């Protein structure tokens, strides 16, 4: 048998660094939401407070995961009463108050932008949006805003003392705290 030569251009370029967005183990999907300038400013401020090992691209994934865990805790609290959330929560503002979150300022329409989420977080965002839309009539952008505010609170209270953390460590920390 003859040996194949490894002199092809593909073989030569295999180890060359790629341009563009860095590759991830699981490819991310674009999800479109409307963000106001204030919400974009919150994201920019969060980037500076993230532990080493996390990057800006991890913020949407972690925010959606935190929201889905918090909604799951609410659902488990009323599991014996055939409800999704407790009786006292009648609108989105009461959910903000339950979680001690600042109410979002209504400063007009946001501009549509894409966020990149892992496939599991896209499913969780859809599930959270479905529940909150059925209960309160909210849209995907409002659900993402709620998740951003939740993650900002989590960053201030539970993640501020961590200097380094990977994405998996923060997901485990969220699960350990709330579940």
State where each predicted segment sits.
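Short, basic amphipathic alpha-helical segments that act as recognition/interaction helices
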Residues: 53-81, 136-166
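N-terminal accessory/assembly segment that mediates macromolecular interactions
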Residues: 23, 32-37, 42-72
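Short Lys/Arg-rich basic patches
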Residues: 2-40, 47-48, 85-123, 129, ...
């Amino acid at each position: 048998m003859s040996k194949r030569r490894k002199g092809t251009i593909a073989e030569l370029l295999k180890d060359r660094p790629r341009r563009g967005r860095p590759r991830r183990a699981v490819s991310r999907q674009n999800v479109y939401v409307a963000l106001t300038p204030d919400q974009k400013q919150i994201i920019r401020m969060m980037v500076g407070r993230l532990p080493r090992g996390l990057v800006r691209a991890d913020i949407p994934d972690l925010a959606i995961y935190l929201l889905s865990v918090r909604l799951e805790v609410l659902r488990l609290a009323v599991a014996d009463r055939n409800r999704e959330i407790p009786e006292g929560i009648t609108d989105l503002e009461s959910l903000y108050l339950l979680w001690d979150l600042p109410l979002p300022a209504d400063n007009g329409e946001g501009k549509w932008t894409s966020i990149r989420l892992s496939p599991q977080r896209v499913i969780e965002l859809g599930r959270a949006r479905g529940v909150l839309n059925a209960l309160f009539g909210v849209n995907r952008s409002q659900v993402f805003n709620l998740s951003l505010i939740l993650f900002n609170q989590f960053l201030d209270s539970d993640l501020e003392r961590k200097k380094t953390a990977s994405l998996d460590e923060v997901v485990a920390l969220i699960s350990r705290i709330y579940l």
